[in-house]
């Protein structure tokens, strides 16, 4: 039987982070993963992460995965792929199917970082080819470079549904609509806004009635639901689509912990093990980290993994109690920073009407996916100024502050609490470098110059689509809802290594469109 100080099940963000944390303290570590590639969800996450520097903010998920893998390899962590753990027992022994062979491994401690699986929603036609999970579509696009379909309807407006919808657009798919039975958008408003300004409509208080097609998806019918989520007759709407993506939540894959005899509980986060603040289960030496203990963001999973790795090192005597306490206290503080604001775990299901600063939230953002013009003036980041200046359409208390760190002239302030709304420091002058625009994980910052030339303004916006426009191109400016508003001319295209594949387009629009225009589309304006 093969023996290791620590066995980790799952090579995703939590598992790799736990392995690194433990190996740094001298433990022999082996990690098993059922997939052919390590990294879990990270390698299909091409978007930039939120948080602060300590949470790897403004770094794309797949790059974080590469960093974790490299660090694990340098620490001589053994990673076994295509390895299905079929059993976990109280004595910390596991059985693993590798190829056609069943292998036995014994650890002095075990960390389960098995993640979660996508939920499905049954409806008429839900087993037709073309009905897929949002995560599956991410795998197809970002790992295998395959378009899931040509015209897609997305069910679910949490962060997964919003992020994947944007990535579908980047892949060249048409997104017919985002649909959700809830009356409000569930994910970050900045994610919704970048989808809305591409012209994608939201249908809230709606659900899928049926998928149409004999051999595959050829259409979908949705309908409105009442406050009890019952279908309202006569509200049916039809869309011609060939793909239906489901982003309706995740369920923790906690079966192995249950099998081991860990105490379990049903919670709003799923069927999860009972753990303490350090991830320790009811069985000494067995820990849980990441989505297996409750669904959160990958940033949280990485910190939970590091905590579990440190506590396993303490449990086995590789780390003193004082050193472990110091390490975990710092990590718990970082985790706590991520769990603040409107989307904090304790706020799930609550109706939030005011920001932490006491500002009324944008109802338009929650119900339509974009800010209404009559709501703009209430938010501190959307300030008028002379010459070129940033306009920050970040209006919810979400954990993120890269813009503050990116600005070389300190024009942007967020403060110690990373969920605070960004504000403009009027004592400092914007240079127009665009670092804040490129660093914003939510693509919610623009540079505005209403004095560009008589009768015209310039707007610099983030752009992550191909083909990339070139200077001199003329096209159409779209407003926050994706509506065509005027003709636009590209006057500058900036692409730097520091921007990490977020190009900056600067377009010239009529002065009266400076407050409206927020996106660029190649081709003429149908209203001209």
Q: What is each residue range found by the language model?
A:
Residues 483-497:
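Short beta-strand-centered aromatic/proline hotspots
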Residues 401-419, 435-451:
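Iron-sulfur cluster-binding cysteine motifs and their immediate structural context
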Residues 452-462:
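Short, structured beta-strand/loop micro-motifs enriched in basic residues and often containing a Trp
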Residues 1-376, 457, 523-525:
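Residues forming the flavin
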Residues 468-470:
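Short, well-ordered loop/turn sites that connect or cap secondary structure elements
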Residues 495-509:
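Short, solvent-exposed secondary-structure boundary/capping segments
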